From Swiss-Prot:
The keyword Lipoprotein does not apply. This is Fanconi anemia group F protein. It is found in: Nucleus. GO terms for biological process: DNA damage response; interstrand cross-link repair; ovarian follicle development; protein ubiquitination; spermatogenesis. Keywords: DNA damage, DNA repair, Nucleus.
């Protein structure tokens, strides 16, 4: 175990160095050995990805070596060769001889042995993500919002994958940091997009990817275990958008419906206005409450059933009144069952 840990630590240091000026002393042979080392660790990742003890031992040691430019997790070994290659390609300090040899080392052609070990697809994916992010950043406010959200969601998903492991502590720390430091509305929008990534993916293999399901579960767990974030998520997202997300994740739909019923109890009936009104500024207005419940009903048949069962149960507990204004549950059911459009 210890030799493997040392190998990984040393490669993490090399990965950090590949961004700096020290590569000016590298020749073609050194670049070749560095790439071989990265591919060896790719085999290590594939062999031990499902072994919890090995992952935990490596996860504990990696952040301390190589700094932020090195390996951040055991899962990062899966793309270590591509990251190394991309950094060398971008580093103008790389010695000329090594720079000339690098393309042939990365793309040896169809006659090369072990073609599945060549980082072509992983390199292309990283390069595309990096280029897309840089382009969107340069466009600034002119960037299409859907493209920006999609790119940020894919980057978040990739980062959660890199954190790896069954322990979600590292994922939660990352998400908490984003929530604390980032623009909160944007974090909520990116979270929603990330939860829809595989549901909207046209490729069946992507939509059923078990590894991707791990990232989704980490994101869902963070959302459901953070009351402040969950409440903000369920208030900020447009009704139709949130209903689409809830329709893909039953635990979220249940939590969302619980919040809506809680917010409903805070409204009171104003006899003079003949309407349900908030008691405090932060309460959800009647019109928005109805719109969100309608959107849930229209999203999926099972959601409509859950909403109606919940409201009927609440109505029965509240006295089963049929007179308008006596019970908010009665009036909500009238809106939903009669199909009154509030959009």
């Amino acid at each position: 175990m210890e030799p493997l840990v040392q190998q990984t630590e040393r490669f993490s240091e090399l990965l950090a160095v590949s961004c700096g000026s020290l590569v000016s002393t590298w020749d073609a042979e050194k670049v070749r050995r560095a790439l071989q080392w990265a591919r060896y660790l790719l085999h290590v990742y594939r062999r031990f990805a499902g072994r919890g003890r090995v992952r935990e031992a490596l996860e504990r040691r990696l952040p301390a070596r190589g700094g932020p430019l090195g390996l951040r997790s055991f899962a990062a070994l899966e793309s270590g060769d591509a990251r190394l290659a991309l950094r060398l390609l971008r580093n103008r300090a790389l010695a000329p001889a090594a720079a000339r040899a690098l393309p042939s080392l990365l793309f040896p052609g169809p006659a090369a042995d072990h073609r599945d070990d060549v980082p072509q697809s992983r390199l292309v994916l990283l390069a595309r993500r990096g280029s897309a992010l840089r382009l969107l950043c340069r466009l600034g406010g002119d960037a299409p919002r859907s493209a920006l959200l999609r790119t940020h969601a894919e980057l978040l998903d990739a980062r959660l994958h890199e954190l790896g492991g069954a322990d979600s502590a590292a994922a939660r720390k990352l998400l908490d940091t984003l929530w604390t430091r980032g623009p909160r509305e944007h974090v909520l929008d990116v979270t929603a997009e990330a939860l829809l990534l595989r549901e909207e993916d046209p490729e069946p293999a992507q939509a059923t990817d078990p590894a991707g399901a791990d990232e989704t579960q980490k994101l869902l767990r963070w959302l459901l275990e953070s009351p402040e974030v969950l409440a903000a998520f369920c208030r900020h997202l447009p009704a139709k958008r949130l209903a689409s997300v809830a329709g893909c994740h039953h635990a979220l739909s249940r939590a969302y419906l619980d919040l809506l019923t809680t917010w409903a109890t805070r409204l009171h009936y104003d006899l003079q206005k003949g309407a349900w009104v908030p008691t405090q500024m932060e309460d959800m207005p009647w019109e928005e409450l109805c719109l969100r419940l309608q959107s849930l009903c229209h999203a999926q048949p099972f959601l409509q059933e859950e909403v109606l069962v919940t409201l009927r149960s609440r109505k029965a507990l509240d006295g089963d009144f049929e007179v308008p204004g006596m019970s908010i549950w009665t009036d909500l059911l009238v809106v939903l069952e009669c199909g009154i459009v509030l959009e």
